[in-house]
Amino acid sequence: MKAGQQGRSCGLISPYLAPKNQSERFAFIAEWYDPNASLLRRYELLYYPVDGSVEMHDVKNRRTFLKRTKYEDLRVEDLFIGNKVNVFSRQLVLIDYGDQYTARQLGSRKEKTLALIKPDAVSKAGEIIEMINKSGFTITKLRMMTLSRKEAADFHVDHHSRPFYNELIQFITSGPVIAMEILRDDAICEWKRLLGPANSGIARSEAPGSVRALFGTDGIRNAAHGSDTFESAAREMELFFPSSGGCGPANTAKFTNCTCCIIKPHAISEGMLGKILIAIRDACFEISAIQMFNMDRANVEEFYEVYKGVVSEYNDMVTELYSGPCVAIEIQQSNPTKTFREFCGPSDPEIARHLRPETLRANFGKTKVQNAVHCTDLPEDGLLEVQYFFKILDN
C-alpha cells in the first residue's frame, strides 16, 4: 500500500466475511522443519473455505502428501504470509502465496501496523485488546517493554521540534508500554479510527466509544498510539520488533516473587486474551511482564518435560502449546504460585465449573488440554518458568 492510501474508504467487504464460493480454494507455499532428517521441507498447502478442508503436496517430490481432509483448527484468518499454522501436528510457516488468485484475495489489502499502549493505559490493556479483537484485528506480536530516552527519541523523531517534545519523552519513558503488531484489511486506517482523535478531550466529544475517549486524559496522556502511514508503521515496528533478530527495547520481567501464566493458543485464537487479562487484573494480580511467543515442538517438550510420563494428556498438551501463538505472563503477588494456581482452578474445566466456578479455567476452558491457561504448579518452579520465557526464549 502506498503512503497516501491510508485514508481510503474502509467499507469494502473483506474476503473473510464474503459468502463462501463452493469451488474456492486458497494456495500457499509452506515450509516445515523435519527434526528427524534435519531438513526444511516445502509443501503446497491448499485450503478450501467451503468446508474447512486442507490438502498438501510435496513440492520437491511432486506428489500428494495429504489428501483433502477436513481440518477444523485452521481458519481463513490464519492464512497470511509469515504466520505459523499447525496442520495435524506439523508446524508450517507460510512463506509465499501459491497462486495469483490467493495473492489477490488475501494479500492485496492486508496490512500490519503498530498499536502501542502507553504507560497511562497499561492497566487497561485487557479492555483495549478486547476492543482490538472485536474490531477484526489479529494480534501477531505483543510485548511489554520499557523505553530508554534514546529509544523514545527514535520513536518520537517526527516530534523533535514540537514544544511538547520533552513532555512526550518524559511520559513515554515513565513506565512500561505494550507494543503490538496488529493485522487486518486497512489496518492503519481502521486502528486510527478505533483510537479516535489524538486529544482525549476532543475524542470524548467526537468519538466517545474510541480508545482515547475511554482511557486517555489529554493530548499527551492519550492511552495509545497508532502509525499514520505505511512508511511510519514499518519504521516504528522495526524499533519495537527488529527484523534483524534483535530483541528491541528491554522486557519488563522482574524475576522476583513471581509465577508463570501461559494463555494457550486456543484461547488466543478464540479471542479470549483481553477477557483473561481483565480477569487476572480484577483478581488483584500484578502483570509485570507479558509477551506473545510462537513456540516450536522442541521448546514445548523442554518446557513440559516435568509432565512427561506423569500426565496422560502430555502429548496433547505439547501439540496444543505449539499449535499457534501463546502469551506468557509474569505474575506477581505475595505467595504468587499458590494463590495464582488456586485462581486458575482445577485443570479439568468441567470439574472447575462445578467446584470453582469463579476460576479462569471454569470461565474460559473447554477441555483438560484446552483449559485456557497453564500455571506453575510448584513454588520452586515459578522463577524457572518465568526465566524460560523472558530470559531464554526472549533472547
UniProtKB/Swiss-Prot annotation:
Domain DM10 intervals: 22-110
Expression across tissues: Widely expressed. Expressed in the flagellum of epididymal sperm but not in testicular sperm (at protein level).
Pfam family, one: PH_NDK7_N
Coiled coil: none
Keywords on record: Cell projection, Cilium, Cytoplasm, Cytoskeleton, Flagellum, Hydrolase, Kinase, Nucleus, Transferase
Localization per Swiss-Prot or TrEMBL: Cytoplasm, Cytoskeleton, Microtubule organizing center, Centrosome; Nucleus; Cytoplasm; Cytoplasm, Cytoskeleton, Spindle
Keyword Transferase attached: yes
One GO CC term, this protein: cilium
CDD domains given in the database record: NDPk7A, NDPk7B
EC number: 3.1.-.-, 2.7.-.-
Main location: cytoplasm
Record GO biological process: brain development; cellular response to leukemia inhibitory factor; CTP biosynthetic process; determination of left/right symmetry; epithelial cilium movement involved in extracellular fluid movement; flagellated sperm motility; GTP biosynthetic process; intraciliary transport
Gene Ontology terms for molecular function: 3'-5' exonuclease activity; ATP binding; protein kinase activity
Highest taxon listed in the record's lineage: Eukaryota
SMART domains: DM10, NDK
InterPro entries named in the record: DM10_dom, NDK-like_dom, NDK-like_dom_sf, NDPK7, NDPk7A, NDPk7B, Nucleoside_diP_kinase
Gene3D superfamilies according to UniProt: 2.30.29.170, Nucleoside diphosphate kinase-like domain
Domains: entry comment: Contains 2 putative kinase domains (111-243 and 258-391 AA), the first one is involved in autophosphorylation and the other may be inactive.
Subunit structure as annotated in this protein's UniProt entry: Component of sperm flagellar doublet microtubules. Component of the gamma-tubulin ring complex.
Family: Belongs to the NDK family.
Role this protein plays: Possesses an intrinsic kinase activity. Displays 3'-5' exonuclease activity with a preference for single-stranded DNA. Does not seem to have nucleoside diphosphate kinase activity. Functional component of the gamma-tubulin ring complex, implicated in the regulation of the microtubule-nucleating activity of the gamma-tubulin ring complex in centrosomes, in a kinase activity-dependent manner. Part of the dynein-decorated doublet microtubules (DMTs) in cilia axoneme, which is required for motile cilia beating.
Protein name per the record: Nucleoside diphosphate kinase homolog 7
Organism encoding this protein: Rattus norvegicus
